Amino acid sequence: MKQKIVLIGAGSANFGLEAVSDIYRSKILEGSDIVLHDTDEKSLKETQAVADKFKDKFGVNFNVTASTNRKESLKRATVVV
């Protein structure tokens, strides 16, 4: 079932990557949009780069984006973590 999943604080290496990894393992969420949000743009970009590599490595179908704009990130979110 496609969802828009927003991960607040995703620039934190432990939280962001572990949460993305857990989502990638869920077949029911495959095809969902994952929005990584953090106020630290540098850390956020690093997390997105690793998340994209994991996505390619594991061959899963998720749309992963990143934003420092909380209001935009939360727009039409179905799940917020």
Give the ranges of each region predicted by the language model:
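Metallocofactor- and cofactor-centric catalytic cores in central/energy metabolism, strongly enriched
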Residues: M1-V81
